[in-house]
Amino acid sequence: MLSLIGFIITISILVFIHEFGHYCIARYLDVKVEEFSIGFGKELIGITDRKGVRWKLCFIPLGGYVKIYGYDSSTRIIDKTKEVNEEVTFYSRSCLARFSIVAAGPLINYLLAVIIFTSFYCYFGKVEIPPIIGDVVAASPAERAGLKEGDKIVKVNNKYVKDFVDVQKEILINGFSSSTLTIARKSEEFKVNIRPQEIIISHPEKKKIGKTFRIGIIAKNEPIHTKIGIFGGVLEAINTTIDISTLTLKAISQMILGTRPLDEIGGPISIAQESGKSMASGAQMYLLFIAMLSINLGLLNLLPIPVLDGGHLIFILYEAITGRLPNPKTRNILLQLGAVIILLLIIISISNDIKNLFY
């Protein structure tokens, strides 16, 4: 029950923030908004404000939308079946204005994450764990490579690392491919190649809930705490957001290239489970979960897939460069292709969720 409640609350928060970004910029640019909906299907409750916007909560809490006057949100074209006041429609605005309206949704998701991370950095400070090995897991890739307690990791794949998080990040970015670690041991410095080992994450009832990989090293538990102000907190929050986005993009590219398994894609059941776990762990963990999910929502919406915000941004850029709208037939084909891609991702994610529930 907590997972279901957590899922509904989490999705509602993220969708509201995302659509509110579209709404705010549309209103700022004097584009009329007809509806602001959380959920799909039959309206459960709603109110119309003095500007004529219908704010409503619908039966199926799996998303939401902002309906802009004279603009069909599913096809991204002017609705010719009804009379419209061209002065306040989406397409009456310049390419830059329309680009701003579309981009505002994903960007406000990023802004939410930065605000949450900033508050954590300002309140708790920055914690760094030096990249010094405290222990090596038996029979792990690290042990086979000859790593020992007390070794300091200087570089991973020729990139300098200043703390253990950097080590984890670089190894994650490289996926299941081998990583080259530069190790400092006493006065000696040498390199080792390590290929991560796949491990199964199991539920206490022995049900598999996912896969990950490790090289088998444990950090020496000597964290360094540093207090930082608001400016430093913002910078750290931005860096954290960029790091998470980079890891996500790398994972997506590896899945496309076939070097990373598709069973890592989680769907609504996974989100519900993680929502419930984070809520049960307290407000701090739940806020961090919201921030992580908000980054992923913003990033995925920016992917150049037709029907997503990113695909529509490509259409606007095409118009800005060529001076003409994309060919309607070509546009419709691309929209249908985009819908198929999204449908396939939904099927894969739900299949993974079901498989992880029973196997």
Swiss-Prot record:
Zn(2+) binds at H18, H22. One of its GO terms (biological process) is proteolysis. It is an enzyme of class 3 (hydrolase). InterPro entries: PDZ (IPR001478), PDZ_6 (IPR041489), PDZ_sf (IPR036034), Pept_M50_Zn (IPR004387), Peptidase_M50 (IPR008915). Residues 104-188 form the PDZ domain. It comes from the Bacteria. One of its GO terms (molecular function) is metal ion binding. Keywords: Cell inner membrane, Cell membrane, Hydrolase, Membrane, Metal-binding, Metalloprotease, Protease, Transmembrane, Transmembrane helix, Zinc. The active site is at E19. The chain crosses the membrane at residues 101-123, 286-308, 333-352. This is Putative zinc metalloprotease RP161. Its EC number is 3.4.24.-. GO terms for cellular component: plasma membrane. Its cofactor is Zn(2+). It is found in: Cell inner membrane. The keyword Lipoprotein does not apply. It is a multi-pass membrane protein. Belongs to the peptidase M50B family.
